[in-house]
Amino acid sequence: MSVVVALAVTPPRETGPGLRKLTYYIACSIDGFIGDPQGDATSMYSFVNEEYQAWMNGEYPETVPAHMRAAVGVDADNKHFDTVIQGLGSYRIGLDVGVTSPYAHLREYVATRSLAESPDPNVELIADDLVGRVRELKAEEGGLGIWLCGGSTVAGELIEEIDELVIKTYPQVYGSGMPMFGADFEPRDFELGEVRTFDNGVLVRKYTRQR
């Protein structure tokens, strides 16, 4: 059984007409790591039980990779996002097993200077000025939000552009590993919104950036 706590949240400051939100939707350990030193987070998979999987599939169906949707019974329209941004490390998880467009139901962007050309027509590479390109995407009229999938380096580069955090905290301590943000020290304030807990020990928190 999951428990939801909804806290009163001050509406975020408007930053422009039609501005789309950039949401960092990410899983991490209790001590804030999104993976081991190489970015591997498979140890967290053991906590994905039926109740928690059903919530993720129902609330964030667009975050289920395209090649897995039929297997897990996801056939829903995009609910929060129509665009995904990820670094090469995150993208390579699928690429290494032959999946060139892991989120074919979204507009896909990969931030990398290592790939000379895109492996898939649906995937646009961003080699330079990642912040500028994301600002262009946020300024587009209409549409849904933008999902920042990871990893640490890309999140660090885009930290000032992030409007919302959705953090899935798994009941594990890593001790060391890949941090949520690869960025220099600077305090940045977020306001806590909804909190959801699950019987498997997973805690999901939603935060809004205070500017």
Please give the residue ranges for each predicted region.
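Enzymes that bind and transform nitrogen-containing heteroaromatic metabolites
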Residues: S2-R211
